[in-house]
Amino acid sequence: MIMTKQKNTLAERLNIGDEVRELKLGATFNPKNTSTAFHTIKYDFKPASVDTSRMASVDVGPNNQVTVIVPNSESSGVPHTVYKGNQREHAKECLMIYDKETGAITIEKLNHNIQVKKTRSEISSKSSHLPPQNAAIMQGQVPGQQISNGSGPSTNVASGHGPGSGAKLENSTMRITSKTKVSTGSRRNNIIDFKPRNSPMQQSSPSRPVAIHRSPQSAPAWDANNAQQTLPSIPMITDDDDFGLRAALHNGSQANTSGSSTGSAVGHSDYGSASSSSHMGKQRQAPHHGHAKRQQRSSPPMVQQQPNFGRNSYNGGNNYAQQQQHEQQRPSPYGHGNSMPMDLDSSRDHELTSKSVAHAAAVLEQQIGGALSASSSSSESDSSDSDSGSDSDDSTEDDRPSQQQQQHQHKAAQMHHQQQQQQQHHLQQQQQQQHFNQLPNLGLGSISPSYGNNHHQQQSRHHPHQQQQKQQSGIYASNGGFPNDLLQNDLQLSSNSSDEDDD
C-alpha cells in the first residue's frame, strides 16, 4: 500500500514554485474606486443539492439585512435555498487572488462580512438568469459585484434580478414550523345556586351538598337593607332555630319556681328568702353553667318577685299558687325529660297545708291565752299573800299550811306553763318539718339534707332580727290574734315575774 503525502501548504495546493512573484494591488486600494468590492459570506448549513455550476444572488436590504439565494440542482426538486442574515464591515482584512493562467497574484481589500442562516419559511422572489460560475465561486467564496483577475478582462456578476421572473419553490429540507393548536373547548363555569343559610342547623346538616368550586359570579351581593340576609360565616338564630332561646327560658323558669317555693315555705323576712333563693339558684345553675347569662337575661322580672314572697307566709302561698297556675297554663316547649315534673294538684295541696297551719296556730293561741290567765291569777294571789304577810306580823302557825298549799299550786302552775312551752316548741318543729316534707310533693324535685341544715342554720341566725322586726311593726296574724313570738315573750316575762315573787 502506497502512502500519499497530504498537501498542507497553499503553494503545494496551487502548484506554485519557489520563484519570486510580483504582488499587485487591486482596485479596492484606490480611494476613487466605486465599482469594485469584495465580500465574504459565512453560512451555517450548506445542503448537498446546491448547484455549483450556477451563480447565486445577493440582495442587500435596509438596516444591513442580507438575503442570499443559492440555486439547487434540478434533480433535487427544489429550485433554490434561501439564506438570510446581516452584514458587517471588515477591518484590515484582505483577499489574495491567484491567476493560474498568468501566474499573477493580486491583493484586494474586503468590504463586508456577511453571516446568514437558512430560513424556514417559504419566500417567493423573481428568478434571474445565472451565468456560469468562475473558480472563485467554486471554492466557496462568493465575490462581490465585480471580480478582477488582475490583467484579464473582468467578469460582472449578476447581483440583481433579470427578466423572466417566475414562482420559485423552497428546498425540501426546510422544516415545517406551523404548530397545531388543539382546542380543548372553553372553560365551563359551573354556576351553583347559593341559598342563604337561615340557621346553623342547616349548615351542620350532613345531607346538604357542599359547594367546593364556586364561581365568583354566583356569590350573593350584600344588601345592607335586608335584615334577614347574613354573611356566610355568621350564623343567625331565627324563628326556625329556637332551641337556645327555649332552653334558656326553660332553665329560667326552673330557677324562678325553685326560688318562689323556698320563699313561700320559709315565710320569713326578705333577707332570708333572698338568701335561700340564691342558694337554690346556685344549686340549679351548677349543671347549666353555659346558660347562666341567658337565664339572667331572659327572666329578670320573675327573679325580682322573689324577695316579696317572704313577707307573709299566707300571701306567699297565694302568690305561689297563682304562679303555679301561670306555669301550668304556659305550654311546655319540649316533651322530653329535661323539663321538671309539675303536679297539677300542687296548688290545692299548698292551700290545704296553709289552712292546717292556720288552724294549729289558732289552737296554740287559745292554749297560751288560758295559760296566761292562770299564771296571772296565781301571780296576783301570790302578791296579795305577800302583802298581807308583810302587814300582819302576828300571823299564827295555822296560816302556814295555806301558804305551803299556795306555793305548791304556784309550782304546779309553773310546771304546767313549762310543759305548754315545750309542746308549743314541739308543734313549731313539726310544722317546719311538714313544710320541708311537703316541698318534694309539689313537683319541684327533692331537696338535699345539706340544704335543709343550711337553711335551718340561716333561720336560727336571723331569728332574733325577725323577732325585733315583728315587735316593732306589730303585725297581726291572719286570724286576728297576736303573733306567736309576742306570746312567747309575754310568757317569758310572766314566768320571770313569778320566779321573782317566789324568791
Swiss-Prot record:
GO biological process: cellular response to heat; positive regulation of DNA-templated transcription; transcription elongation by RNA polymerase II
GO molecular function terms attached to this record: transcription elongation factor activity
Any one of the GO CC terms: nucleoplasm
Compartment(s) where it occurs, according to its Swiss-Prot or TrEMBL record: Nucleus
Compositional bias (Low complexity): 312-326, 415-435, 484-497
Pfam family, one: EAF
Bias (Basic residues) ranges: 281-296
Record-linked InterPro entries: EAF_fam, Tscrpt_elong_fac_Eaf_N
Range of residues in the leader sequence: none
Location of region: Disordered: 143-223, 251-503
Compositionally biased spans, kind Polar residues: 143-158, 170-189, 251-264, 297-311
Keywords, comma-separated and alphabetical: Activator, Developmental protein, Nucleus, Phosphoprotein, Transcription, Transcription regulation
Compositionally biased intervals (Acidic residues): 382-397
Modified residues (Phosphoserine): S199
Family classification: Belongs to the EAF family.
Role played: Promotes transcriptional elongation by Su(Tpl)/ELL. Essential for development.
Name recorded for this polypeptide: Ell-associated factor Eaf
Taxonomic lineage from the root: Eukaryota, Metazoa, Ecdysozoa, Arthropoda, Hexapoda
